[in-house]
């Protein structure tokens, strides 16, 4: 019996367990990007070991400009700068807090901007605060460099929620 309890204790000590490991979330973020861009992002996130995570996401946005005819942003000109894309992000944990974490986000994106296809690379930072219910509040600083079309650089802030399931 003593031998069995020593083996069980050694087995329990060798198995690593972390809070939040393998959790899954539905993410929803929105915000403004430079230059005159409104952005909304939705996705699926899976937590990995040591606070790292992977996110598969899609986003839609609109870059508005002044209409040369009416001299301001009009209904006719507002929706002409739309884009959509999707991608995969790896989120490396830089710092863990009691109820939150700070991560580096990096990954590729593919999509279309007013009919022209593009490839992009996204990088940035993310801070998450975890509420008692498991829902997370996110503050995201985003930098996106796009290739193969004129709108080559976007950066800005997004806020959002992560809902566990």
What residue ranges belong to the model's regions?
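Flexible, solvent-exposed loop segments that connect beta-strands
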Residues: 8, 23, 54-82, 110-114, ...
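Short loop/turn motifs that connect adjacent beta-strands in outer-membrane beta-barrel proteins
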Residues: 19-23, 50-51, 94-102, 115, ...
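Solvent-exposed loop/turn segments connecting transmembrane beta-strands
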Residues: 28-41, 80-82, 110-121, 145-154
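Outer-membrane beta-barrel "beta-signal"
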Residues: 86, 153-165
């Amino acid at each position: 019996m003593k031998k069995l309890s020593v083996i069980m204790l050694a087995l329990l000590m060798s198995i690593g367990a972390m809070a939040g490991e393998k959790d899954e979330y539905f993410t929803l973020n929105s915000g403004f990007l430079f230059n005159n861009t409104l952005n909304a992002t939705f996705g699926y996130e899976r937590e990995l070991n040591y606070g790292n995570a992977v996110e598969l996401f899609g986003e839609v946005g609109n870059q508005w400009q002044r209409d040369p005819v009416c001299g301001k942003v009009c209904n006719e000109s507002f929706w002409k700068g739309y884009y959509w894309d999707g991608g995969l992000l790896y989120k490396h944990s830089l710092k863990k807090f009691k109820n939150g974490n700070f991560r580096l986000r990096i990954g590729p994106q593919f999509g279309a901007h007013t009919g022209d296809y593009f490839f992009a690379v996204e990088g940035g930072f993310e801070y998450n605060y975890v509420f008692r219910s498991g829902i997370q509040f996110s503050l995201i600083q985003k930098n996106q460099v796009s290739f193969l079309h004129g709108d080559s650089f976007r950066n800005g802030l997004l806020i959002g929620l992560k809902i566990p399931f």
